[in-house]
A protein has these predicted regions:
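N-terminal signal-anchor/first transmembrane alpha helix
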Residues: 1-60, 88, 92-93, 110, ...
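Alpha-helical transmembrane segments of integral membrane proteins
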Residues: 2-3, 95-128, 144, 175-337
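Short amphipathic alpha-helical coupling elements at transmembrane boundaries
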Residues: 3, 7, 40, 50-53, ...
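Hydrophobic alpha-helical transmembrane segments of membrane transport/permease proteins
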Residues: 15-66, 155-195
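Juxtamembrane/transmembrane-helix interface segments of polytopic membrane transporters
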Residues: 19, 23-27, 148, 152, ...
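Hydrophobic alpha-helical transmembrane segments
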Residues: 41-56, 147-160, 205-210, 247-264
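An internal, D/E-rich "acidic patch" concept
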Residues: 58-114
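Hydrophobic alpha-helical segments embedded in or immediately adjacent to the lipid bilayer
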Residues: 115-119, 128-180
């Protein structure tokens, strides 16, 4: 297992180097002049040129790249022009908000999609099979920002069941003492049920928005994988041996159907990181997605590069976790690794 993990990490290094190079080049190709934006509309050419020199944008591109990689090797992602704060600090402060939202959305979608896919596979042609198909079609068809706007309109404007979509906490509540920077967990640790209730009420609509977006591929893959496994020889043998239907489904079929589902989960999690950008803007969520969008609009290089690099590292770590789960579920993967 350790050998397999080491190999995966070695293969990930060229990918991260490629991400650094491509991100640097793409940010430099963005329209707009960061120096002009930072100087303001009233600045003259001399002032803009002075700021350009201060930011190092007057240097050749190759020199800018080597300076960037040298800073990166020391953990320095640069400073944001719009906020004046170190990008590493901003990302560290905002990442828990995005992670909490993404993880809860994924948990909700998995809690619905896995049972729905299993039931649809074990009862083909039934009403629950048709429900699974309708749900997956709707989840794929609806844009994530449209789903968010509909939920806000229905549950906030029309019914009044949800609080205003303005961040992680209501204005009347203060943040719980920081332990994990996940408000739900920190509020439970502090035994502050009121803050927990407020944080959950703010989190539920954006999390459901992400869950609707991610539910379709998980349910569809679960159904297809279960149908393939249920028609296999070892399942027929288990049934012929007199085992109960629940034992056959849970012990034999479901476990063997999980490998492609886990692969789908890793892809869905990656998609959710991208969909987070739109959801955070709709719900004014203070995560790294909205931070990157604001930086992109203002041609602020450092936050965009920091955001992409953070997403790349998270993606590499996610793939490593998926490989470890493969080894836990299927011992053949450990032997091949």
């Amino acid at each position: 297992m350790l050998t397999m993990i080491g190999k995966r990490l070695m293969f990930a290094i060229p990918s991260l180097i490629g991400v650094v190079i491509v991100t640097f080049l793409l940010t430099r190709a963005l329209p707009g002049d960061p120096a002009a934006y930072f100087a303001g509309p009233a600045a003259n050419k001399e002032a803009i040129e002075q700021i350009r020199k201060k930011l190092g944008l007057d240097k050749p591109l190759i020199e800018q790249f080597f300076r960037y990689t040298a800073d990166l090797s020391h953990g320095d992602l640069g400073n944001s022009l719009t906020t004046g704060q170190p990008v590493a600090t901003e990302i560290r402060n905002r990442l828990p908000a995005s992670a909490e939202l993404t993880l809860l959305g994924l948990v909700i979608s998995v809690a619905i999609a896995l049972p729905l896919g299993v039931l649809a596979a074990t009862r083909p042609g039934s009403w629950i099979d048709h429900l699974c198909r309708i749900t997956t079609t709707a989840g794929v068809s609806l844009p994530v920002f449209f789903t968010g706007l509909v939920l806000v309109y229905v549950f906030y404007f029309r019914l009044g069941w949800s609080p205003a979509p303005l961040g992680r906490l209501d204005v009347f509540y203060s943040s719980p003492p920081a332990v994990t920077n996940f408000y739900l967990i920190d509020a439970l640790i502090a035994r502050d049920l009121e803050t927990f209730r407020s944080a959950l009420s703010q989190l539920i609509l954006p999390a459901v928005t992400l869950a609707v977006f991610s539910l379709a591929p998980i349910a569809r893959m679960t159904r297809a994988s279960m149908l393939a496994v249920l028609s296999s020889d070892f399942v027929r043998t288990a049934r012929a041996s007199g085992l109960s239907p629940s034992t056959v489904i849970v012990t034999y079929a479901f476990r063997n159907a999980m490998l492609p589902v886990i692969t789908t989960l890793s892809m869905v999690f990656s998609f959710l990181l991208g969909a987070n950008v739109l959801v955070e803007k709709v719900f004014a969520w203070p995560g790294i997605g909205s931070y990157a969008v604001e930086a992109l609009i203002s041609s602020d290089f450092a936050p965009v590069q920091g955001f992409v690099l953070t997403m790349a590292v998270m993606y590499v770590m996610l793939n490593l976790l998926i490989d470890i789960l493969y080894g836990v579920i299927d011992p053949r993967v450990r032997l091949e690794g």
